[in-house]
């Protein structure tokens, strides 16, 4: 089975590019960030501070995650509820980064993520796919861009959705998540030694897509 690992910081465009690449190659796309977002959402709904590891650990036995791939798109279910849309807020994104630093949460999700890769060709994106989840992935890509470029893209997405958030706030959030993701003790964000680096700061979506498609094709034929 072929496995493609795409890692990188928040707002690098991993999910958007990964969806398109998976559709192009006919692979199943697994968005691991959605899993952490779902844990973060559950913590927020339970009135718990996502950074409080002990409080979040106590919630894990009450959480059942299920996945469905509908027309190649991953849908995630939290205790039977489709939360695929509910998890896409900035607040939940920050909560995801916080629970992502929790070793118990990472362990809770790790086997789930690995099991999804066993029976099928997959393309998985996240923060530690190439380093921890799929260390023997067929292809590893580390996707990045400057904080300013990533904040600009995210701000434009918010504008299109009618969310009026100042650019400065978006940039501050991006930088805060970068710090949290790179400084956590459990599986910090870093480039795998055998990953190919792609900086998309000066590339548009199509250019980034073609560059990644070429990287994958060169490895898998």
Per-segment meaning from a language model:
Residues 1-3, 119:
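Pre-Walker A (Motif I) flank of P-loop NTPase domains
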Residues 6:
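Hydrophobic anchor at the beta1->P-loop junction of P-loop NTPases
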Residues 11:
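Walker A (P-loop) phosphate-binding loop of P-loop NTPases
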Residues 14:
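Conserved lysine of the Walker
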Residues 17:
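Hydrophobic positions on the alpha1 helix immediately C-terminal to the Walker A/P-loop
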Residues 23-89:
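N-terminal phosphate/diphosphate-binding loop that engages ATP/GTP or pyrophosphate donors
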Residues 84-161:
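ATP-dependent NMP and nucleoside kinases share a basic, alpha-helical "lid"
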């Amino acid at each position: 089975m072929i496995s493609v690992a795409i890692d990188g910081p928040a707002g690098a465009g991993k999910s958007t590019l990964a969806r398109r690449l998976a559709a192009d190659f006919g692979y199943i796309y697994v968005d691991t960030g959605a899993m952490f977002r779902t844990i973060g959402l559950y913590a927020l709904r339970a009135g718990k501070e996502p950074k409080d590891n002990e409080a979040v650990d106590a919630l894990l036995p009450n959480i059942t995650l299920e996945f469905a791939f509908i027309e190649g798109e991953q849908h995630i279910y939290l205790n039977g509820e489709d939360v695929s849309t509910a998890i896409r807020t900035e607040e939940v994104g920050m909560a995801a980064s916080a629970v992502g630093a929790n070793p118990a949460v990472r362990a809770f999700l790790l086997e789930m993520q690995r099991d999804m890769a066993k029976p099928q060709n997959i393309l998985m994106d996240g923060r530690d796919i190439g380093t921890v989840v799929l260390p023997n992935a067929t292809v590893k890509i580390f996707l990045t861009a400057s904080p300013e470029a990533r904040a600009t893209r995210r701000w434009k997405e918010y504008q299109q959705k009618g969310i009026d958030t100042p650019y400065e706030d978006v940039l501050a959030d991006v930088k805060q998540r970068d710090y949290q993701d790179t400084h956590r003790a459990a599986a910090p964000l870093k480039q795998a030694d055998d990953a190919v680096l792609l900086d998309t700061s000066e590339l548009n979506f199509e250019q980034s897509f073609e560059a990644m498609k070429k990287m994958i094709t060169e490895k898998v034929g």
